[in-house]
Amino acid sequence: MILPCAAVLFDVDGTLVDSTPLVERAAREWAAEYGIDPDEFLADAHGRRTSDRVADFLPPDRVREATARLDALEATGTDGITALPGAVELLAGMNGLPHAFVTSMDRAQLELRTGAAGIPLPPIVITAEDVPDGKPDPSGYLQAAGHLGVDPSGCLVIEDAPAGIAAGRAAGATVLAVLTSHPRESLAAAHHTVENLARVAAAPDGLHLRL
């Protein structure tokens, strides 16, 4: 199956990089410090900015300090961070197809995790610091499309989480979901779904999928 597109906009954590062990370990330590149920905190965490996640559980006057604490815990190491299947190969074979990263991580987290996973950063990267609102708001994907000079409707967004899928659709893009972190039924809003990026190959006019 061929998905024609003028540009590809990649989510990072859960799509290209697996940092689950680090994120869960940090979240559980943080939740214990702040008296929050760690399972509740993690339940809707994936694909969202840290500050937005924290704001769901703490009053506004504590969000900045608590966000900084969680960021610090997540920056304590890179153990267990790996590239997800097919990610390195797909990026190496983009063959001039314009692409960008749009992530809910801040720049420091992005560089730490992609570096540990061996994922090279493209020239255009949109992080949590670059947008007024995080996913599911479409701001990040709209910014990335603008920087690439491509109409959002001509972009293919690749995501692994419901919040990111909602952001891609709200931007007007076609959304491809990978089944790396969520069950298929929770990603039903995506236009297309594949197991992982090992089933995707780049071509000058878009991406080829092996379903």
What residue ranges belong to the model's regions?
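Residue-level detector of anion-binding/catalytic polar loops
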Residues: 37, 98-100, 174
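Hydrophobic residues in well-ordered beta-strands that form the structural core
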Residues: 18, 101-103, 177
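Residue-level marker of regulatory loop/turn positions in helix-turn-helix DNA-binding domains and
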Residues: 83, 102, 133
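Asp-based, Mg2+/Mn2+-dependent phosphohydrolase catalytic module
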Residues: 1-6, 106-211
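Short, surface-exposed connector motifs at secondary-structure boundaries
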Residues: 92-98, 151-152
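N-terminal helical cap/lid subdomain that shapes the substrate entry/recognition surface
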Residues: 2-95, 106-107, 119-120
